Amino acid sequence: MTGRVCRGCGGTDIELDAARGDAVCTGCGSVLEDNIIVSEVQFVENSGGGSSAVGQFVSLDGAGKTPTLGGGFHVNLGKESRAQTLQNGRRHIHHLGSQLQLNQHCLDTAFNFFKMAVSKHLTRGRKMAHVIAACLYLVCRTEGTPHMLLDLSDLLQVNVYVLGKTFLLLARELCINAPAIDPCLYIPRFAHLLEFGEKNHEVSMTALRLLQRMKRDWMHTGRRPSGLCGAALLVAARMHDFRRTVKEVISVVKVCESTLRKRLTEFEDTPTSQLTIDEFMKIDLEEECDPPSYTAGQRKLRMKQLEQVLSKKLEEVEGEISSYQDAIEIELENSRPKAKGALANLSKDGSGEDATSSPRCEEDTEDEELEAAASHMNKDFYRELLGDDDGSEAAGDPDGGSRPLALESLLGPLPTAASLGISDSIRECISSPSGDPKDSSGDGELDLSGIDDLEIDRYILNESEARVKAELWMRENAEYLREQKEKEARIAKEKELGIYKEHKPKKSCKRREPILASTAGEAIEKMLEQKKISSKINYSVLRDLNSKGGGSPPRDDSQPPERASTKKLSRRKRATTRNSADPGTSTGKRLRPLLSAQPAKKAAVGEALLLSSPALGAEPVKPSAVLVESGPVPYHPEEDADEEDAEDEDGEPCVSALQMMGGNDYGCDGDEDDGY
């Protein structure tokens, strides 16, 4: 029972069936309601043990499709791979779209394109950044936003051709017809970057008018819109007295200089370029030009046809020239006088040759004849120059009948100095002294003799020319002057703050004079004087060492070996006694360097051999212990001087190197060796 009343009978006994969703009056049987919708929230348990609300909308990329381990395990396995891909794609699209300043509608459209690419597996094997950039550029093309593919390439630092390849693939696979880009979309953007100031709108409108004219003349199809925009903006800026250089326009529209100049050249070939500024702003030509590619093809075809016609005419002219040349050669052959003497013999020899010889042999024969004729002609010419008279020639040449023809008889009269008009010049050259050199030690003044005053006046600029040249120089070096001015201002500011550091002038390196020496030793000595190898070497001691080693007396080989050995043994005994009496001296001798030269070494070897011989009856000497020097060897010149005086008083031979190094004590005193 409910509080509702039946509209048919007025009864209140109404039965509600929640399963069928209807309300029926039990009195009259009329159906009061059917398909009753319950507004309460119901939950359904799924197969995994989780619960979900009934009637809740779950999107394709929503969180409702996340798998779980069931109600007993509250551990989430995470999203599917495709859900993660879509989420990352949305994040990257919003990031790039914010940098390009795209609205939310464009971003949603780009994300829909990305979902279509993911569903068709177009992202496999391609970087996500490339696919996202292609989707954004698809939106820019379809929505008509002033963005270029080069902008996305700059943001991603990717080659523009790689992005273009991905864009074409997506457009083909997704069946999206991207419309052609209208260059007029980029004019306001580029005009704002070129900073035209108050005339920005006027320059933009003029550039748009130029672009419309280019589109009518078929310059738009197949061309990048940035190149057309750059050419239109450059012309519009010049029309409104703005000096925008080609480099400035290139830096804004992102095209190379050759492309911009090519667009200007193509526009120059149209009839619109022949109009003045006022005529262009008022008149619209109805006729359209042919596309530049078609015009270039027709020009190439005409050039090829013209080359063919010229080649045919050239062949005809060459045939006529060859016929004329043959006729001239025949006439010259007939008018040539008969040769005598050596030339006649040569002609007879040539006529006696076989007529069936090859053309190459005939050419060789003609060359030989010409050489022989030239040699005879040169002889006659030299004789005329030397002034030989006919009498002397006759006396010098007894066989005058066999003399060949003169040069005049063959070639006619030769040109003389008078006929050439150079006789005066030759006379001046002969009369002027050739050996007097010109005085080169002048007083610094220019020799202007022979130069006209008008020519000198042309070298000097007047005021207007100097002013124009100065303006040209200032315009060409404006950037350098601006940099110098900024540099001076920066230096002045640093000087005021006290942080300026003056650069020390570079010292000029003087070239050392070469070492002049007659021997290698002298050169080394001079080199050591200029630059010492080490500051720890006493070079004076080295000089004394060289003088002592070079001046040591040689051994007397004529002395009997027994006497020499006796003296050396006595010297050894005396030295042993002295060393045993003064152990400090022995230790000092051990530390002394080897000061003797090569002869002293040889003497030490000889003494060692004599001491080791059994005939003398001396005891065998034990092998000396190895000395290890732990530092620099001290040198005592006073002790060496005392020893040298003592040796001179005894009148005995020089002390050997073994004795100077304390070799007589090696292996004998164990106490001294313990110190090393």
Swiss-Prot record:
A Gene Ontology biological process term: regulation of mRNA stability
SUPFAM superfamilies: Cyclin-like, Zinc beta-ribbon
SMART domains listed in its UniProt record: CYCLIN (SM00385)
Biological function: General activator of RNA polymerase which utilizes different TFIIIB complexes at structurally distinct promoters.
PROSITE patterns the UniProt entry points to: ZF_TFIIB
Biased amino acid composition, Acidic residues: 639-652
Compositional bias of kind Polar residues: 577-588
Superkingdom to which the source organism belongs: Eukaryota
Binding site for Zn(2+): C6, C9, C25, C28
Zn finger (TFIIB-type) location: 2-33
Modified residues (Phosphothreonine): T365
Chain intervals with Basic residues compositional bias: 566-576
Subcellular location: Nucleus
Main location: nucleus
Protein name from the UniProt record: Transcription factor IIIB 90 kDa subunit
A single Gene Ontology CC term: nucleus
Subunit record text: TFIIIB comprises at least the TATA-binding protein (TBP) and the B-related factor 1 (BRF1/TFIIIB90). Interacts with BDP1. Interacts with MAF1.
Sequence repeat start and end residues: 91-172, 185-269
Cysteine disulfide links: none
Keywords (A to Z) from UniProt: Activator, Metal-binding, Nucleus, Phosphoprotein, Repeat, Transcription, Transcription regulation, Zinc, Zinc-finger
Transmembrane portions of the chain: none
Family assignment from sequence similarity: Belongs to the TFIIB family.
Residue ranges of the region described as Disordered: 342-371, 386-408, 425-449, 543-603, 617-653
Modified residues (Phosphoserine): S449, S552
InterPro entries named in the record: BRF1_TBP-bd_dom, Cyclin-like_dom, Cyclin-like_sf, TFIIB, TFIIB_cyclin, Znf_TFIIB
